Every structure is written in C-alpha cells, then in structure tokens.
Amino acid sequence: MKRRTYLGAAAAVALAGCSSTEEAEDDNETNDGSEDEDGDGTPSAAASELEPFDDFEDLDAWEARIGALSPETDRSYTGSQSARLESGAGDDQVRLVRELSEPRDLSGTRPGLAVATEEEADFVVQLIDEAGDRIDFRQRVHAGAPLVQCNFGVASLDGDPDLSAVNEIHLIRWTGDDDKGSVWVDDLRFASAPDVGKVLLQFDGGYETDYTRALPILEEHDYPATSFLATDLIREDDGDEGDHLVRDQVTELADAGWTIGSHSAHGADLTNLSAGRDPESEISDARAWLEDNGFESGARYFSYPLNRYDGASLEQAAANHDLAFAGRYPSQGIAMNPHLCSRVTSPGAGEARSVLDLTAEMGGITALAFGELDDDSEGTLEEAVGHLGELESAGELEVITPADLDESFVY
C-alpha cells in the first residue's frame, strides 16, 4: 500500500488560515532538468538559466481530462496566447494533463507557472513518475491579479516519486459550487533549487515583540531576521500609544544584523484600502521612510500585508522593491518572479518543525513569517529556531537574508 506523506506544508497551510498575517481561507483537498552546481549546493548561473518547458503556443500536447481547454489570444505572459481552463457545472476541478513521450528528469527543480484566476484559489502543478507516485507543488493565486509567474512550493507527496523519471504533468485547480471561474496559464518552467535548504526568518508589521520577544531568541543562535515595518505606525517614544516598535528599537534590531524592510505605510490590505489611500502611496511612502531613516538596504524588500495582492500592488512592489514576499508554501526554487517569493505564515510548533524538516530533506528556499508574538507564538518561534539550529549544525540547512536571496537565488 502506498504511503501518503504530507511533509508539513499541508498542516502549515491549515494553520495559516488562522494566522495573524493572513486572512482565513478554506482549501479544497483530495486525495531536461539536471543541474550543474558550484560545489556548495548553490545552482550555477548556467543551471538557473532554464528554457521554458512549455509556452502554450501549441495546445495539442495537453489534454483537458476535467473541464475545458481553449487558447486565449487576448491574454498571454509570453508569446501570442495562453491556455484558458474552465470547469463544467458538475466538476470539482479543472485538470490539464500532458503525457511525456519519454520520462523527463526534473529532479532538483521546482515549477514556475504564469497563472491568473477569476476566483482566489490554490493552483497545483503535479508531477507523476512511471510508477504512478506523485508530488504536488502549490501556490495561492489571488483574483484580480494579472497573468504573472508564480513560484511554487512543495505541498505533498504520494508514494515515493522518482523525479528523475517524470511521465506526466498535471495542472489542477480545485473548484467549489460558487467558484467556477476561468483560469489562465502560460510559460511553464522548471527552476533549479539549492540542494542545501535555505531558510529566511521574517516578522510582519513591525510590532514591539520583534524586539522584546524575537530578538533574544535569535541572538542565542546568532541568526539574522527581517522586520517588515508598517512605517507610519512606528513610535518615536516608548510613551507613545501603540504596540509597534519604537524608533530606537528599530535601530537596535538593525545593529543586531536584522534587515529592516517594508510592510507598507499602514500594513493594511492593499487590495481593499480605505478612502484616501492607494497602493502607490502606501508602498512608496514606506520605502521613502526607510531610506530617510537610514535603512536604505532593507528598503529594497517588501512583504504584502495579509499576503494579499492585486495588479496595482504588484506593479508598485516591482517599481519600489527588489524582492517581495507572499504565498503559502515552502521549499521553492530559484525565484522566477522576485516579487512573489513564497513564504509560510504563522505556523504552529509542529508545522514549523515539519516545514524545516521538509526543506532539509528536499532543499529549496523557505521563508517562515510571524506576526505579533504572544506567549504561544513565542514558544513556537523558540522551538522552531532550536530545531533550525540542530539542522544547521548538521549541515542540512542554512539561514540566509533577503540580500542573500537577491544575490544568489533570483532568476
């Protein structure tokens, strides 16, 4: 009997639905790629320069096993068209399948795919080997966003898939009774992933607990982290009302090796701002504050409030920052879209441990993000960092910064 293993990611996503940094969401569930390296587990420049696997200019190689497939000439990421997928009235999914004429070696890679959807949903890239064992890569795609490349992370394994001999590729979007909207896909690629897993530690919103709770834990291991500030909420004095960092505390975090990045001016949902606010001012004003206050290097990096984005916020993130973080899944590969780097938000202790174990086992890049810490989440952070220390000491993981990611792991 085949084993079915959810390597922490599924549990982490379930928890993320209750996180302080992401809206509650419900998920529907059912059951030549070899690379050269520089010798340290880091893909070489040549290895990361991958040609597209499929540009969807010719759809004959694909079969819509569930739902309908058609070319969309009015919407494309590359070339003259994309593939449009639509589910039928009684379908619980759309499923596009490509059977390969010969097994393909996709070991050590992660998929990237340009995706747009009318309804917010997880999208799945599933690889199946000759024995029928499979691995699911996923990413959350938001409604109202343009057709852009998404970096997919590892979600689950069924059996023991041999990724050096992939026979089928499935593109899947689960649907419900009230979310039968179209999905567009284009430009399927496979990017190399570092053999030695890379981990980023992040804190959203610029809460004072970054300084009072997180910093002492990370200092014990000499680990860097990133504090993404809602800059208009930073206090000038400890006596000022609020639960966000004081300006001097931000400086001490930076002096301790932390990256000070942006979570926008107010840390509000950029897809649903109140009157008088817009993504352009929320993002550009926060960057200006960071630059004016001596945090120029961190001003290059951004995390989307509540992990939500649309076309306007994507455009402004790209215009103002080198990297931006959103998503739900761990162990991505080289960032094919540097403004949608994946992350796992507010995991519980067990989920954080599983995500770290997954990254140690499979490599790739995982960002663990927390919001304001309370007693429970502080305990989770402490346990996760302790386990991270064990895996790092064993040579199985490495803690990196956004600058490291930008320098070495962007396509």
Residue ranges and their predicted role:
Residues 197-199, 219-311, 320-322, 334-340, ...:
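Metal-dependent polysaccharide deacetylase catalytic core of the NodB/CE4 family, i.e.
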Residues 32-68:
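Extracellular carbohydrate-recognition regions
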Residues 19-28, 34-35:
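Bacterial lipoprotein signal-peptidase II cleavage site
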Residues 87-95, 103-154:
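Extracellular ligand-binding interfaces
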Residues 4-20:
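N-terminal export signals
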Residues 72-92:
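Short carbohydrate-recognition loop motifs
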Residues 40, 156-165, 170-203, 207-210, ...:
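C-terminal active-site subregion of NodB/CE4 polysaccharide deacetylases
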